[in-house]
Amino acid sequence: MPKQDRAIRTRRTILVAAASVFEEHGFQAATITDILNAAGVTKGALYFHFQSKEDLAYGVMAAQGRHMGVVPPRACKAQEVIDTVLLQTYRLQKDPMVRAGVRLAMDQHASELDRGTSFQDWGKGMTLLLDAAKEQGELLPHVVPSDTADLVVGAYAGVQSMSQAVSGYTDLNHRTSVLLRHIMPNVVQSSVLTTLDLAPERGAAIYAEIQALMEAEELAGASA
């Protein structure tokens, strides 16, 4: 195996191990020794890629952002907002890296970390979608996209945190759908509202859609 490929695989192994440890113990209680044991790598290999526990945490948080995936563009941007939230819901239930990144962002004991970046990045993405929705006439006149984006991100953070505590995310689909059913009527035009799909199971369908698109791209690249 080429050195570069081996280094990429080692870095990935360390991040997956760190995600597992951070998800289970939180940032403060997690130790480098725990992560080394979970990864099965040497201390030298770990420190080649990550300089500290904080560096590892930022690596996990960045990776969970990439793992969230990007919803394929929708003609209706309000639906794209909804799909972004529902895809995150599915990822939280299925992807340990996403769960670990969210736990780190929500961990009030992790005072050493800049936890606000995750929320700000998601808020910026939501604002762009809502700006596009407003340009297309999908939003009610009073809606300020940046304010609504912050509301959606903050409310969702609370809902997912409650779901994690109460059911280990097993009821997050339902809770997310309820949240969206309460928010969207105050955000979008009634003519748009009737077209929106807020079904709890939609997140899984979006994930399958993304996987199919990725596989098609890989096949196209292989045959080129």
Predicted regions and their residues:
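C-terminal peripheral helix-coil segments that are non-catalytic and often amphipathic
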Residues: 79, 83, 91, 124, ...
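Key DNA-contact positions within bacterial/archaeal DNA-binding proteins
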Residues: 44
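Short secondary-structure transition hinges
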Residues: 88-142
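Short, Lys/Arg-enriched C-terminal cap helix and immediately downstream tail that follows
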Residues: 58-59, 187
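All-alpha amphipathic helical-bundle segments outside canonical DNA-binding/catalytic cores
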Residues: 117-118, 135-151, 167-175
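Conserved phosphoryl-transfer catalytic core
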Residues: 64-67
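Basic, helix-initiating cap at the start of DNA-binding domains
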Residues: 1-25, 29-41, 51-58
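Hydrophobic alpha-helical connector segments
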Residues: 59, 69-98, 149
